[in-house]
Amino acid sequence: MVVFEGVKKESLLKLKGFSKEQPKTVHEELRLKKGEVYLILYSSGKLLLQGNQDAVEKAAKELEKINIGKKISAEAFRKEQGWVIGTDESLKGDTFGGLVVAGVKANDELRQGLAELGVVDSKLLADKEVLQMAEKIKHIVPCEVKSILPEEYNRNREVTFLLNKLHKECADYLFPGKHVVDKFPGCTVGEIQVERAESKYIEVAAASVLARAGALQQLDYLSSQAGFRLPKGSTHVKLALFELKERGLDFRKFVKVDFSNVKEFL
């Protein structure tokens, strides 16, 4: 699979040798076919290339030459036989928020549905796209999302234990199926443990979208409780930590108190 972003319909219609196909979902702007390659343009401006891997790579090189858009992914998803459960997490490295773990279960038919939605690693999507795609994913595949707030995280403070617990709970809820985990340090769950699994298995990519959507929703909730917008990540958080302290708010309810950048404010 190859994905381009910032692609215009008018540019695709000028391509020679491609025939128009009937769109398969309401989110498709245009679907073209040439030989063993499908070009699927979504309303977000993302163009998905699917089909024979060699033919897809050849077509992608041609599209790059004419600057059709920005190439953002060129890694084909691996395919397992039968039902596969993919799990991924979000907020693990964020100062604000607790943890969110999501699981998605799919077979060949549902994997095709996820591909037609344009599912990719959530890191390739803007926040708005993540929230929109998460809702679509929930409507076509079995899924589960586990979200814990900072207060619960801080009662345990053992992130490895929590991650193993939440990944397993998601997989157990969706069982049966082969469990693929986005591998993390100390991972003891899953039949297949792979680093960067969200770029290799479409089930994990879909789970990464659900987990990140859950993280955004949790940060929105915590922001409403704090009375000001809480930042994502851990790089630019000092002003927000200072604001928490100035307002006399309980740090345990908003941040991971075991993070080194938090300790100086306690």
Protein language model annotation of sequence segments:
Residues 1-266:
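RNase H-like, Mg2+-dependent phosphodiesterase core
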